[in-house]
């Protein structure tokens, strides 16, 4: 059963993501609601997780709308366009990430998220 992650940013932007049924994500259910400081890196929003996930990065070339775990920073990353590492419109992660799912609602609103904005994260099973 997949996970639904709701992201409510202090600017009023709301994004809903669906993550795969990855056993390691059970750790997020223990902290099913938390706040974090969102950061922007080009057209990527990322924020630190309250628990460390034991997942290894697999790739850097991403697709618009993909959600991934960044092991180096213990962050969840949402790609919605080119990043500083991109050569064209395809998002490229800073280092290898583990793809976990997709944005299913609000992808276009991510451009309105500011650097260091607070995000309220809610995680539940579908």
Residue ranges, per PLM feature:
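A short beta-strand micro-motif
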Residues: 3-10
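Glycine-centered tight beta-turn/hairpin loop motif at sheet-sheet or coil-to-beta transitions
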Residues: 10-12, 73
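Short, contiguous acidic and Ser/Thr-rich linear segments
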Residues: 13-22
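Glycine-rich active-site loops that engage anionic ligands at enzyme catalytic sites
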Residues: 21-24, 32-126
């Amino acid at each position: 059963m997949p996970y639904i992650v709701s992201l409510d940013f202090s600017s009023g932007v709301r994004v809903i993501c669906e993550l795969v049924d990855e056993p390691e994500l059970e750790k997020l259910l223990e902290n099913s609601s938390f706040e974090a400081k969102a950061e922007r890196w080009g057209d990527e929003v990322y924020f630190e997780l309250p628990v460390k996930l034991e997942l290894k990065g697999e790739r850097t070339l991403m697709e618009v709308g993909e959600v991934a775990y960044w092991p180096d920073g213990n962050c969840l990353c949402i790609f919605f366009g080119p990043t500083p590492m991109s050569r064209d419109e395809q998002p490229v992660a800073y280092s290898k990430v583990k793809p976990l799912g997709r944005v299913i609602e609000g992808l276009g609103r991510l451009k309105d998220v500011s650097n260091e904005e607070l995000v309220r994260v809610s995680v539940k099973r579908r």
